[in-house]
Amino acid sequence: MTDVIRAEGISKSFGPVAALTDISLHVGRGEILGLIGDNGAGKSTLIKILTGYHQPDGGRLLFEGEPVTLKSVVHARSLGIETVFQDLAMVDDLPVYLNLHLNRELTHRPLPFLRRGEMKRRAREALDSIGISIPSVTTEVGMLSGGQRQAIAVARSVYSNAKLLLLDEPLAAMGAKESAVILRLLQELKQRGDIAIILIAHNYGQVVDVCDRVNLVQHGEITFDRASADTSVAELLELVNAEYRLGGGQ
């Protein structure tokens, strides 16, 4: 399996506070890596480094086997690194097809008129290609369920030819039915075999079920890296709780 992204010995500090210490991870095409850990463990900082928002103080990144310095979020996106956050960054009163093309609108150059017909067609094709069921691409996003909205956010990244997709708590505040929509979508993307996925989640059952491997981040370090088939929710909970007890519950 070819690694899409590989981090080697990544460190990051903010003033006297060490956010990451000697972090190494990798994820390849057709693979889902689960990233777990308590709030403040360093997951968000790591994601921001992988998406060009922060630059590391030490270590290096390799993208598709080549050393890379991600200078900005825009630079990372130009390489095919896309992120879906919990807040989605979508416009509720715009229809699905315009949200899917947000900041990527098709126009009749040199005139600034939108090619709405083609945008609708491409939006429908993008949704159908990964099995997302939406009654109409002209429906306003604000009228959809949380699971449908999150699915559209994922589809937007895939439509942008993502090679690495990072999902930051995509299932937070979702019910079981809506979560199932996203978990099925992730499995569909995995089966395509052309996208590497990093999933940050607090539901360890979902992580074990959908991910190929699990990394546990504690105090800015990866302390656990194992295939999901070789671990369990009980083991992950014990690792986190043991660290919590050793820390005196702080």
Give the residues covered by each predicted segment.
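Glycine-rich phosphate-binding loops of nucleotide-dependent enzymes
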Residues: 2-250
